[in-house]
A protein has these predicted regions:
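Short, well-ordered alpha-helices that flank and scaffold nucleotide-derived cofactor binding pockets
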Residues: 13, 17, 21, 42, ...
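NAD(P)+-binding Rossmann beta1-loop-alpha1 motif at the extreme N-terminus of oxidoreductases
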Residues: 1-57
């Protein structure tokens, strides 16, 4: 199938390289920075045409168009294409948070539209092109578009799942929680350990094997089954010591994270046979401490 890609950043370049190796014909690369697009094009055979943003009328022969621009530009790109694509191709964007509704102008002009979002970090186009194998892709859009997207992902040796349009933002929140916010959480753990007199670098080095072992457990168990430590044991006294130590040493917002995650942990522990009496007491303490912390933040 003939493909054009609008927006040759890291992901757009990675898709161009990966799809060309799977037999797709990359016809056009549309980019602001011709130098970046040229580097990608030189590694594709036959070499695609490089166009600027004002030449989208030349995309009429494309069967599939990917819009891989920044999220803030997708709607304007779609509006600019509407009416120019007489062959009514499939059009996909690759935003994680936006749904195919952002392509409504193209849909109204007869194009089949959808979104394809790979759950992988692409920091370089050439490295990214080799990372799609076994990666999950979130698909969303009209039925025909999703069917085509499933084939594309299969050809890339990836795995796909579809969500309804109304759930696209929630899906993305899940992905951000599992990636960027996990990183933020680990940074809090590092700060806690560093407050014991270690450097941040040493604290991170010490904690990473523990983090890795947790993820290894999660590969085989549910979150509730993988829960270990203070909350899994419903250890009230140890939790009290944690709270006191954090209060004494660290900022209130870090205590809030501990309290909120502690509450979530008690819910997980309930399903694993921990002491119901102790868990009820832990919940009460967490709620009281959270209220105090909020009051202190407001007064501060």
């Amino acid at each position: 199938m003939k493909i054009s890609i609008i927006g040759i950043g890291r992901l757009g370049g990675a898709l161009a390289l990966a799809l060309s190796k799977k037999g797709y014909s990359i016809e056009n690369l549309i980019a602001r920075q011709g130098e970046t697009a040229e580097k990608i094009a030189e590694n594709i055979s036959p070499k695609p045409q490089i166009l600027n943003a004002s030449e989208t009328e030349k995309l009429g022969g494309s069967e599939i168009i990917f819009i891989t621009t920044q999220d803030s530009e997708i709607e304007a790109v779609a509006a600019g294409l509407a009416g120019k694509l007489t062959n009514k191709p499939f059009v996909f964007h690759t935003s994680g948070s936006l749904s195919s509704q952002i392509l409504r102008d193209l849909n109204e002009s007869g194009c089949r539209v959808g979104s394809i979002h790979p759950l992988v970090s692409v920091s370089d186009s050439f490295l990214g092109a080799r990372r799609f194998k076994d990666v999950f892709f979130c698909l969303e859009g009209d039925a025909e578009a999703v069917a085509v997207a499933e084939k594309i992902v299969g050809d890339l040796q990836g795995k796909s799942f579809a969500v309804e349009t109304k759930f696209k933002a929630l899906y993305h929140a899940s992905a951000v929680t599992a990636s960027g916010q996990v990183t933020a959480l680990i940074s809090i753990a590092v700060e806690m350990l560093a407050a014991c007199g270690l450097t941040n670098e040493k604290a991170q080095e010490i904690l990473l094997p523990l983090v890795k072992s947790t993820f290894e457990n999660l590969e085989k168990q549910t979150p509730a089954e993988a829960l270990t430590g203070t909350f899994a044991r419903a250890d009230v006294e140890t939790m009290k010591k944690h709270i006191a130590a954090i209060k004494e040493t660290l900022a209130p917002e870090l205590l809030e994270v501990y309290l909120q995650l502690g509450l979530r942990s008690t819910h997980l522990a309930e399903t694993q046979g921990a002491s119901a009496e102790n868990l009820a007491l832990m919940k009460k303490i967490l709620a009281v401490e959270n209220a105090k912390n909020w009051k202190g933040n407001l007064q501060g």
